[in-house]
């Protein structure tokens, strides 16, 4: 087998293995951090199993020959948008979560599925940018209903990256698609002006509170978690530590610096940044495993000229800057499934020249 086909499965397997080792080393009965341990155990199972599926996909000649499969994937965003519209008609003005978790989690899942859905149409014979942007419109509609700031900022950037990668040799199509994307974004802003404005004002208030030593806000708590997580890592960069040990360190730091108290609410969850979370629990090995995964995704996307995998990777890395998605069950399943689907789709033809 070509060595390049081992890099991505190995990076996925490494994360799963480290999570399993960490769980086995520190999980005890009746732990107050049971949810945290089981979230990592679920990720370990999914990534270890998923690494073999990804390896088989990379080393096989499996192709998606029928375009009907691509159109089925393309329809996913519209099905999600339709369901979101129905939920919104019942619970108007609430952040939608599809009843399966948080609104933020729903946004991340929708964006990752939307990337697969949008990229699928670019591999068909009717790969007009209008169809891609129609998908983007459906995804942005759902993201606006979740009112998740990170995805509302990140997804348009991903759309632009996809258009540049796919239509860079067709200036006319590229220009018209960018103009249409701007029009779609403007429409979303106009339609959802009130909730977007509210979330924007909340962000400004959160930042203002944080500068005034109050981190008990959404953004303030994130910034406090980043500071605490880095502090914990720097004190012992080569060590694994339990969830209990990390929480104890968080409490000690807050006792010294009360302005960081907003982070304590999430001591039994995660630190809302992939690198900081990995470093705070698994030290340098945790950070290396996360960066290795990112590198492997970009590397395979480049080597296989896989537009879809490149765009998905941008989404995974982008979300990882402000949250943790390599965690728990649902989103890791989506990530592994998306990688496999995009690799299979890419076997039809190459799209990055």
Q: PLM features: residue spans?
A:
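Aromatic-anchored transmembrane helix interface
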Residues: 7-23, 30-57, 68-72, 77, ...
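Alpha-helical transmembrane segments of multi-pass inner-membrane proteins
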Residues: 49-92, 103-168, 191
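Transmembrane signal-anchor hairpin modules in multi-pass inner-membrane enzymes, especially those
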Residues: 1-26, 57-67, 71, 121-130, ...
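Long extracytoplasmic/lumenal interhelical loops at the membrane interface
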Residues: 216-220, 224-227, 234-235, 241-282
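Hydrophobic transmembrane alpha-helices and their immediate junctions
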Residues: 173-176, 280-314
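A membrane-periplasm/extracellular boundary helix in multi-pass inner-membrane enzymes
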Residues: 166-212, 230-234
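Juxtamembrane "helix-exit" motif on the non-cytosolic side of transmembrane helices
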Residues: 21-32, 85-94
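Transmembrane alpha-helices of multi-pass inner-membrane enzymes
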Residues: 312-317, 326-353
């Amino acid at each position: 087998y070509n060595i390049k086909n081992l890099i991505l499965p190995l990076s996925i397997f490494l994360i799963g293995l480290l999570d399993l080792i960490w769980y086995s080393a520190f999980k005890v009965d009746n732990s107050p951090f049971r949810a945290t341990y089981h979230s990592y155990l679920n990720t370990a199972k999914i990534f270890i199993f998923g690494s073999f599926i990804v390896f088989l996909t990379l080393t096989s000649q499996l192709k998606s020959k029928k375009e009907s499969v691509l159109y089925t994937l393309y329809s996913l965003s519209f099905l999600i948008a339709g369901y979101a519209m129905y939920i919104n008609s019942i619970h108007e003005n609430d952040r939608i979560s599809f009843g399966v978790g948080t609104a933020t989690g729903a946004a991340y899942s929708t964006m990752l599925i939307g990337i697969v859905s949008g990229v699928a149409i670019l591999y068909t014979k009717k790969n007009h940018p209008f169809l891609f942007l129609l998908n983007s419109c459906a995804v942005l509609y759902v993201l606006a209903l979740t009112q998740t700031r990170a995805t509302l900022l990140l997804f348009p950037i991903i759309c632009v990256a996809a258009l540049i990668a796919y239509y860079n040799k067709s200036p006319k199509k590229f220009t018209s698609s960018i103009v249409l994307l701007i029009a779609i974004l403007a429409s979303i802003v106009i339609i959802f002006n009130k909730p977007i404005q509210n979330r924007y004002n909340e962000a400004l208030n959160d930042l203002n509170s944080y500068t005034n030593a109050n981190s008990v806000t959404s953004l303030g708590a994130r910034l406090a978690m980043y500071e605490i997580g880095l502090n914990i890592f720097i004190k012992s960069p080569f060590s694994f530590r339990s969830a209990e040990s990390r929480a104890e360190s968080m409490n000690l730091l807050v006792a010294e610096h009360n302005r960081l108290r907003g982070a304590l609410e999430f001591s039994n969850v995660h630190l809302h940044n992939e690198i900081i979370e990995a470093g705070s629990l698994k030290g340098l090995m945790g950070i290396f495993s996360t960066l290795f995964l990112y590198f492997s995704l970009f590397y395979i996307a480049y080597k296989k000229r896989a537009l879809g995998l490149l765009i998905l990777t941008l989404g995974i890395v982008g979300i990882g800057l402000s949250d943790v998605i390599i965690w728990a069950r649902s989103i890791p399943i989506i990530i592994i499934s998306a990688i496999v689907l995009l690799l299979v789709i890419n076997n039809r033809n190459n799209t990055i020249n």
